[in-house]
Every structure is written in structure tokens, then in C-alpha cells.
Amino acid sequence: MMSDALRAVILGIVEGVTEFLPVSSTGHLLLAERFFDLGEGNFWKSFAVLIQLGAILAIVAIYFVKLWRIALGMFSNPGDRRFVIGVLVAFLPAAVIGAAAGGYIKAYLFNPWVVCFSLIVGGAILLWVDQLDLKPHEYDATTFPLPMYLAIGFAQCLAMIPGVSRSGASIVAAMLLGADKRAAAEFSFFLAIPTMIGAFVYDLYKNRADMTTDHAGIIAIGFVVSFVTAIIVVKTFLSYVTRHGFTLFAWWRVIVGTLGLIALAMGR
């Protein structure tokens, strides 16, 4: 039987690898729970959300200098203030819909069938967008027009369906609205900070009864593993997509979703 520590390490790796790639971390965690006996029980369902904080802090660590400069200039620099407003505007749709319909979404959509279909459809869309002859005109994620930030925020709401991918929805929307691949990916990172912190705080409060000091060590393991893994993945990801695009991730989604459907059809 798998030890809790090993389970925490595996889930931390899955979270760190998939959170910022356009492949759906939630979808992969749900499939891992279903097919590999990982994450059963209320605690492990909450654990999957709690270790996202490690991935969030990886983004803060990578972009610390830029984020600190923006924080210091927010009240004196119009450009910095506008970017902060843009991130908040993009975050707002998901916050409202998540608060209003989060329970319904988890009750009816968090199942492996939905995940597999979402992975395949999302992969096909990502592949299509990546092959389009787009003419980008936005090369800096901190200077998008405010309506563009809002549109990306609405697109991110689709990621409440497990398997869609928060970063994938944000990246596709940004590219269709004129961002180049690197800027689209970077804004998905910035938008992840308030979005994932909100999900973390909400889930921590909602499931506080399942959290005890007995779980502190397991959560710490998953947190550290997701943090380290996410740092490695984000740095590699930006360099890769700038040169090669998103085709690899699109096909990964399609393959994982297809294999998942086959396994489900066979009664797994």
C-alpha cells in the first residue's frame, strides 16, 4: 500500500508539472485519483487544492523583481496601476462565478468522463489556434488593453470545468485577441496568482474541519515538491513555447483524454 508521504510527493509533482502548462492540473489530479488510487477521501481532495499554494509561490519567486517593482509603483506609476487593475478585472469573472456556482460545478462536473472529453476538445482547440496564422500586436503582458484583460477573464471561467485548463483557456483567449505566445503564457501566470490564492483560501475555509495538525507534514511535502517542480517547469515552458508553440501540449491532452476514455469504457 502506498505511503501518505509518497502519495504527497507524486501529487506534488503532478501539480507542479501541470499547473502552468495548458493541460489542466485539476484534470490530471482527478485522473490520478481514479486510475492510480491517489487522493481518495476528503483530505486528499482538499490536499490537491492546498498544494497549489506551492505552485503559486513559484510564480512569485520567478517574477519577484517585476512584481515588487509593480507593487511599489502601483500608486505612482499609471502603467503599473493599470496592470494591477487589469489583473483584478480579469480575476473578477472567475471569482463571481466560482462563488455562485462552485458547489454545483464540483458536484456535477468533477468526474473523469468530463475530464477526458474536456482534455480532448481543449487539445483540439489549442492545436487549431497554434496553427493559425495569427498576427500578434501585444508583446508585453503588462500592457494589454483593459477590455482584453476582461475578455481573458471570462475565458478563464471555462476552466471551472475540470480538464479545460485555466492556463489553456487564458492562453488561447490572449492569442486570439492579439498577444504573442510568450506574452499570452506570462499573463496566464500573473492571472493565476489571485485566482489560485482565492481557490486556496476558499477551499481551506470550507474544509477546515478535515485539516488537522496531523496532516501538516504531508501538506508540507506536497507544498515543497509542487514549488520546486513548478519553478523548473515554468522556466522551461516559456523558453519552449517561444520557439515551438503549443502543439506538444495539445497532443498530450488528446492522448491522455483518449486513453482515459478507453480505460473508463473498459470499466476502470
Q: What are these model-predicted stretches?
A:
Residues M1-R268:
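Multi-pass membrane proteins that catalyze or facilitate reactions on polyprenyl-/lipid-phosphate substrates
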